[in-house]
């Protein structure tokens, strides 16, 4: 089915609800893409168009979060955060251009594997980082190289990249989870912004779907921040894993079933 330029009331309600859920998930633990992407595909958008539209829809929430952490930004692993941001922006541009050049059918086959990578990062990223940190010493150059790869991934797809940053920053920069909130949030916003520029310029965003999703994501981000103060962290984690696991299974069945 080709992408719809106009969506009906039911589809609009669906993408608004998905945006609300995605915004809340991002505010709580990340993984909002796993709520927004399936909804956009369900209303008839090709996977690559849905991915681009989802990126733009979730960007205001990411930007607002980054702005909120601006006073906490500091060097990460001995590297100025501005240098990391510049690398992330260029890498995000490269990743998003790669998506634009990827045929729709090819992306249909690739995306389940990207989702699986994100799921693995959620399940074992922190443990793997702790295991490596006890055995290897990694310096600023490795951090720059890894940040470039994360930027490309964030521009191309982005699902789970925040969780990957959480795990890898702990390994490469040797900082705790709380200290990495500010740089991680900023790098996510930078990668998303770079990708959004490319997606908008190349006409990959379906605005009739993006606009209600943006509204939902803003509402969900606000509500998620409030709810997050009351929910046990373990419950948030298992909910995120459940949504991600179910989404991954559906996309594998869709691509290879």
Regions found by a protein language model. Give the residues of each.
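Small-residue-rich segments of transmembrane alpha-helices in multi-pass membrane proteins
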Residues: 42, 47, 85-93, 118, ...
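Structural signature of hydrophobic alpha-helical transmembrane segments
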Residues: 11, 45-60, 107-115, 152-159, ...
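Alpha-helical transmembrane segments of multipass membrane proteins
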Residues: 20-24, 39, 66, 93-97, ...
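Selective hydrophobic functional segments
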Residues: 53-106, 192-235, 239-242
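Transmembrane helix exit motif
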Residues: 63-74, 96, 104, 113-138, ...
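Residues within membrane-spanning alpha-helices of integral membrane proteins
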Residues: 12, 55, 111-115, 119, ...
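Selected transmembrane alpha-helices and immediately adjacent juxtamembrane segments
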Residues: 2-46, 132-181, 188, 211
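Membrane-interface alpha-helices at helix entry/exit sites of multi-pass transporters
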Residues: 45-55, 77-83, 174-185
């Amino acid at each position: 089915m080709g992408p719809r330029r106009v969506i009906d009331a039911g589809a609009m309600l669906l993408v608004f609800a998905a945006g609300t859920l995605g915004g809340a998930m991002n505010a709580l633990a990340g993984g909002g893409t796993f709520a927004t992407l399936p909804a956009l595909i369900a209303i008839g958008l090709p996977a690559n168009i849905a991915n681009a539209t989802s990126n733009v829809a979730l960007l205001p929430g990411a930007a607002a979060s980054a702005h909120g952490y601006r006073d906490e930004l500091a060097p990460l692993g001995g590297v100025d955060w501005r240098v990391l941001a510049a690398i992330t922006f260029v890498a995000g541009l490269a990743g998003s251009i790669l998506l634009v050049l990827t045929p729709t059918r090819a992306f249909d086959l690739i995306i389940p594997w990207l989702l699986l990578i994100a799921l693995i990062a959620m399940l074992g990223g922190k443990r793997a980082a702790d295991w490596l940190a006890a055995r290897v010493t990694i310096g600023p150059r490795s951090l720059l190289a890894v940040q470039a790869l994360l930027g490309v991934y964030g521009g191309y797809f982005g699902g789970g990249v925040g969780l990957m940053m959480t795990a890898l920053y702990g390994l490469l920069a040797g900082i705790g989870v709380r200290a990495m909130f500010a740089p991680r949030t900023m790098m996510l916003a930078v990668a998303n912004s770079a990708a959004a520029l490319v997606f908008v310029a190349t006409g990959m965003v379906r605005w009739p779907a993006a606009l209600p999703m943006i509204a939902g994501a803003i509402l969900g981000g606000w509500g998620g921040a409030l709810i997050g103060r009351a929910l046990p962290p373990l419950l948030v984690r298992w909910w995120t894993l459940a949504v991600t696991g179910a989404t991954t299974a559906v996309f594998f069945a869709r691509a290879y079933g």
